[in-house]
Amino acid sequence: MKLVSWNVNGLRACLGKGFLDFCAFADADVICLQETKMRPEQASFDLPGYERYWNSADKAGYSGTAIFTRKTPLAVTYDFGIDEHRHEGRVITAEYPEFYLVCCYTPNSKDQLARLDYRMAWEDDIREYLLELDGKKPVVYCGDLNVAHREIDIKNPGPNRRNPGFTDEEREKMTKLLSSGFVDTFRYLYPDKTGAYSWWSYRFNARKNNAGWRIDYFIVSERLKDKIRNADIWSEVLGSDHCPVVLDLDV
């Protein structure tokens, strides 16, 4: 089963930058999107063979997630946990016979870490949610998780130590998640690979210089790790400040 995850940084804009051509090229069973920044009625496009599930933020033009799937899920749910987590369209869960798929756009901690306290609460709550699902069947957790976990996952770790996405607090939450029975699929296959990033600032020619961050993930339950055929980062795909990440799973 081939799964793709991509923060498109506004799907309407991405549609004008070859999104449908990308979908044809990817030939994925499931495409998970983050930061769609739209409601489904705001754009019409033809994507034959895929069912579409959307979770839009209350605030127009902000956040949002979507799952496009060739395989009909057993069930689809939106958001999780407390009311505070339910207004920004950040999570969709699709249940398949073999696993739960959780598409997530993790809240950014913002400039001056203005939202770090909320982010910490989110991380604890999403981990609890994933563990609850994992008690029923394996989990595939994907999306823009807004953290570069280790120094190898960011081009310039030193200057970014207190920047959103690379604080000790955020990185420790990822460590805690992985320690609770989950596997970072890319690092499982490529533990020492450098220069592998999924997001680049639009400033300073960051993408041209590959001054990036790996903040987009496929994370799976420990018991799925032997089913990982491949995990990849398609850094050559343009259309957003992020690139797609891909998981091939033998299920």
Predicted segments with their positions:
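N-terminal, active-site-proximal structural segment of metallo-dependent hydrolase catalytic domains
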Residues: 1-47, 51, 57-63, 78
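Active-site-proximal beta-strand elements of phosphoester/diester hydrolases
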Residues: 1-9, 98-110, 142
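Active-site beta-strand/loop signature of hydrolases that rely on acidic residues for catalysis
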Residues: 7, 23-41, 101, 130-151, ...
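Metal-dependent phosphoesterases centered on the DNase I-like endonuclease/exonuclease/phosphatase
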Residues: 30, 51, 122-211, 215
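Structured beta-strand-rich core segments of catalytic domains in phosphoester-bond hydrolases
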Residues: 37, 42-109
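Conserved beta strand-loop-helix elements of the APE1-like EEP
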Residues: 60-75, 204-226
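Active-site beta-strand termini and strand-to-loop segments that position acidic
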Residues: 70, 94-97, 221-222, 247-251
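Surface-exposed cleft-lining segments at the edges of enzyme active sites
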Residues: 81-82, 107-123, 158-162
